[in-house]
């Protein structure tokens, strides 16, 4: 099986498109076969931050975290509470923590490359449409979207499913319910496990 979440799902799509007989199951999670205009716009802003910020990885990560969660998720987690020790809101402290954490794990070139890969997801090549390419993939395809995802929106997976269900019998659409947005597939592990159990 090829299973991947977010950019990993985009890479799984690319692998299956390049080798249609590679896998029995293709399971992209919170992802799509292409970077749409919303993804391109956000990765463009990431690129600008990475080029111009004095703290490029930290600041890029802070912006990215806003696309990975939802206002409801932040309300649920933080509720406008303050970190009295630092004199800032807990949501600000949390964002700074994630920025610093990633800066300690990633080099700038690796983050730039990841952002580039995310912005260029696209299985269409050599004049062949996505419909034709996906139709040639032998694998059983399970699209797993998150109902509150503000990054790879569920409407994109729904559009892919509607485009292909008449042409390809073994394509399925699943939707994970979560208030947490794009990161829901990482947070709602029990719900993810339930969906995967229906596949395997």
Describe each model-derived feature in a short phrase.
Residues 130-134, 148, 171-174:
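Substrate-recognition/cap regions that form aromatic- and gly/pro-loop-enriched pockets
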Residues 150-159:
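Conserved alpha/beta-hydrolase "acid-adjacent" motif
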Residues 134-138, 164-167:
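Short, conserved loop/helix-junction motifs that constitute active-site signature segments
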Residues 158-200:
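Catalytic active-site module of serine/aspartate enzymes centered on a nucleophile-bearing elbow/loop
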Residues 1-37:
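Conserved hydrolase catalytic core segment
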Residues 97-98, 113-133:
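Active-site nucleophile elbow and catalytic-triad environment of alpha/beta-hydrolase enzymes
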Residues 137, 143-145:
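Short beta-strand/loop motif that positions the catalytic acidic residue
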Residues 22-101:
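Alpha/beta-hydrolase-fold enzymes
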């Amino acid at each position: 099986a090829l299973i991947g979440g977010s950019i990993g799902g985009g890479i799984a799509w690319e692998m299956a498109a390049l080798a249609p007989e590679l896998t029995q199951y293709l399971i992209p999670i919170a992802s799509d076969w292409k970077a749409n205009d919303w993804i391109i716009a956000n990765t463009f802003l990431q690129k600008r931050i990475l080029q111009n910020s004095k703290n490029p990885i930290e600041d890029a990560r802070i912006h990215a975290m806003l696309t990975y969660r939802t206002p409801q998720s932040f309300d649920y987690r933080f509720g406008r509470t303050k970190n009295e020790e630092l004199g800032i809101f807990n949501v600000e402290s949390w964002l700074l923590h994630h920025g610093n954490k990633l800066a300690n794990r990633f080099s700038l070139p690796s983050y730039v490359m990841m952002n580039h890969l995310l912005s260029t997801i696209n299985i269409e090549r050599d004049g062949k449409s996505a419909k034709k390419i996906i139709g040639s993939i032998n694998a059983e395809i399970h699209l797993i979207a998150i109902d509150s995802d503000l990054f790879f929106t569920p409407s994109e997976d729904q559009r892919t499913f509607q485009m292909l269900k008449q042409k390809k019998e073994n394509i399925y659409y699943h939707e994970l319910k979560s208030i947490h947005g794009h990161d829901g597939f990482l947070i709602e592990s029990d719900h993810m496990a339930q969906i995967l159990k229906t596949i395997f």
